[in-house]
Amino acid sequence: MGRDIMVSLEEAVIARYTSHGEKFEILVDPYLAAKLKEGQNVDFDELLAIEVVFRDASKGEKAPEELLSKIFGTTDVKEIAKKIILKGQVQLTAKQREEIREQKKRQIITIISRNTINPQTDTPHPPHRIEKAMEELRINIDIYKSAEEQVPEIVKKLKKVLPIRFEKRDIAVKIPAEFASKAYNALYQFGAVKQEEWQPDGSLIVLIEIPSGIEAEFYAHLNKITKGNVQTKVVKKYSE
């Protein structure tokens, strides 16, 4: 949820850090602060409502530069802000927490749907089924951990109520010469190309590894690009 300009003072929340008996506060975009806490890169010009480190933001009391240098080893506000957010507390409202949690839940469901299958049917679980199972199990979403980091543990829990496993597939693809150049770039959007061979007639043969959950999407995209003139074959499956 990035912004083109810095967050306004009205929308900003306080991030607070205490060290050596001293309190330090900054005014930040709550959503970008959450992204930073989970390890993402953010634009500090958008993150900070004002480039000032306070002792007490509500009173407008600034922290002296000598104190900043003593505690943080620098007076660079952006460097200090990063430490305050990562080591301290961000004062989110209940609404902001719920918005971030919902956004993260959607990311987690998408990742699971794309990277796992139902081994009984050899097809992916639709997102709504995954969401229903998560609700049934009352799975907690950590707003300060990335979606990717939380997926493995959540899938373990889902196994209690769903037949589910992580799986990847190696797929051999042959594309006619007239569509090869256009399809070439599209292939890399779906997975890891392990081998590629350009044939004398200009056609392209590729071995690509993709998450099993996007196999149907992969075929549909190739068929659209090649107008149905594509050959595919699943060569190998990797399960976890």
Curated annotation (Swiss-Prot):
Xref: SUPFAM superfamilies: EF-G C-terminal domain-like (SSF54980), FYSH domain (SSF89895), Hypothetical protein AF0491, middle domain (SSF109728)
Domain of life: Archaea
GO biological processes: cytosolic ribosome assembly
Family of this protein: Belongs to the SDO1/SBDS family.
Protein name as annotated: Ribosome maturation protein SDO1 homolog
